[in-house]
Amino acid sequence: MIRIGTRGSLLATTQAATVRDALIAGGHSAELVTISTEGDRSMAPIASLGVGVFTTALREAMEAGLVDAAVHSYKDLPTAADPRFTVAAIPPRNDPRDAVVARDGLTLGELPVGSLVGTSSPRRAAQLRALGLGLEIRPLRGNLDTRLNKVSSGDLDAIVVARAGLARLGRLDDVTETLEPVQMLPAPAQGALAVECRAGDSRLVAVLAELDDADTRAAVTAERALLADLEAGCSAPVGAIAEVVESIDEDGRVFEELSLRGCVAALDGSDVIRASGIGSCGRARELGLSVAAELFELGARELMWGVRH
């Protein structure tokens, strides 16, 4: 029996259940084990709780032998590698884009100046301000139902959340606008899951690897390399999205490449630095580092310094 650790929220258990069900479909026995994390217990802003707020307890449970594997929202994992563990599988990614849920079916551009928009993410807040729509950004915590209720109750005019979370909970009907990357770059690894286990458990690593999706792994590897090189945690105002795209060589043959777009935003929305690049899927990390280097050249370090101080 493979014991899969998960946070206790409905979204987390729903995500972990997709991994459990895929393992069972592959002929393996698997069950979910709920682990409480600091991020679930505290209502303080995520950025104030530090790195690994949703993942440390799950890793401790693996280390203690309480669970064999853990399912994380990949964007919550610290960028610094922990040699005790390995991400054995990255299943096919859900839609990485952000989504708006607004009153009266409105889009961001239709909301009146001064409308209250809730988000838990400095990245979203910075990019929302950069759109110059005159919206008032408000902090937002709690599970997805709690966040959605802020709109239906009239406390907020709109919220911006990950579309993937709404999809996994069957709440896409609530979406009034899906934000394209040109409007708002998502968080690195948004919409992707990381299935982690102890690095020394080679038998389990091999079993979990059956769930791995090569395109998703390449995209997430590039996005996370960019994030790590910027020395930015999961709550920093950094956006990135990579996609496997088809290109044509000089002989007319179709081949696949990896396209990466990244940005760093000032928290007040006064500046957004953007860069992009393209490379081979097998050199995803190098692509991430290359785009990060371009962001640095364009002034990302100074923008990040302003964020940190």
Curated annotation (Swiss-Prot):
Q: What keywords sit in the KW lines?
A: Porphyrin biosynthesis, Transferase
Q: What else is known?
A: The porphobilinogen subunits are added to the dipyrromethane group.
Q: Which reaction does it catalyse?
A: 4 porphobilinogen + H2O = hydroxymethylbilane + 4 NH4(+)
Taxonomic path: Bacteria, Bacillati, Actinomycetota, Actinomycetes, Mycobacteriales
| Annotated Gene Ontology cellular component terms | cytoplasm; plasma membrane
Q: What is this protein called?
A: Porphobilinogen deaminase
Question: What organism is this sequence from?
Answer: Mycobacterium tuberculosis (strain ATCC 25618 / H37Rv)
**Residues bearing the modification S-(dipyrrolylmethanemethyl)cysteine:** 234
According to its UniProt entry, the protein's GO biological process terms are:
heme biosynthetic process; protoporphyrinogen IX biosynthetic process
Q: Which GO terms describe its molecular function?
A: hydroxymethylbilane synthase activity
Q: Which domain of life is it from?
A: Bacteria
Does Zinc show up as a keyword for this record?
Answer: no
Q: Please give the HAMAP family that the UniProt record associates with this protein.
A: Porphobil_deam
Top EC category = transferase
EC identifiers of the protein? 2.5.1.61
Which CDD domains does UniProt cross-reference here? PBP2_EcHMBS_like
